[in-house]
Amino acid sequence: MAVLGLGTDIVEMARIEAVVERSGDRLARRVLSEAEWELYQQHQQPVRFLAKRFAVKEAVAKAFGTGIRNGLAFNQFEVFNDGLGKPNIRLHARAAELAKEMGVTSIHVSLADERRYACATVIIEG
């Protein structure tokens, strides 16, 4: 396997909190998949949840080398946790098509957060 892409993103929690205070759930609806939206609505710290998901999705878009354009949308990258809590990515719609075109065989996600920041790194292999 070869590394096809690497992406990293860091998000300031206060920035996401300001957007949520200003525009309500608009950012969450645009960024989150349906499954993530359900978790967001029930989460004890929804801003923190959203910031972490946003960081991962930005890192995935960077790893693909495309950013969010040409039919790609944040909600096509779904972040979920395995039984041990490790973050993973599930791809939908155009994101899944792009992964197939690129020959992606695995996507690795690392996510860290502290009081003020969330940081994600994504490696795509094929």
UniProtKB/Swiss-Prot annotation:
GO biological process: fatty acid biosynthetic process
Protein origin, superkingdom: Bacteria
This protein's record includes keyword Transferase: yes
Amino-acid positions noted as binding Mg(2+) in the UniProt annotation, renumbered to this chain: 9, 58
Keywords: Cytoplasm, Fatty acid biosynthesis, Fatty acid metabolism, Lipid biosynthesis, Lipid metabolism, Magnesium, Metal-binding, Transferase
Entry similarity comment: Belongs to the P-Pant transferase superfamily. AcpS family.
Protein name according to UniProt: Holo-[acyl-carrier-protein] synthase
Organism encoding this protein: Serratia proteamaculans (strain 568)
Gene name as annotated: acpS
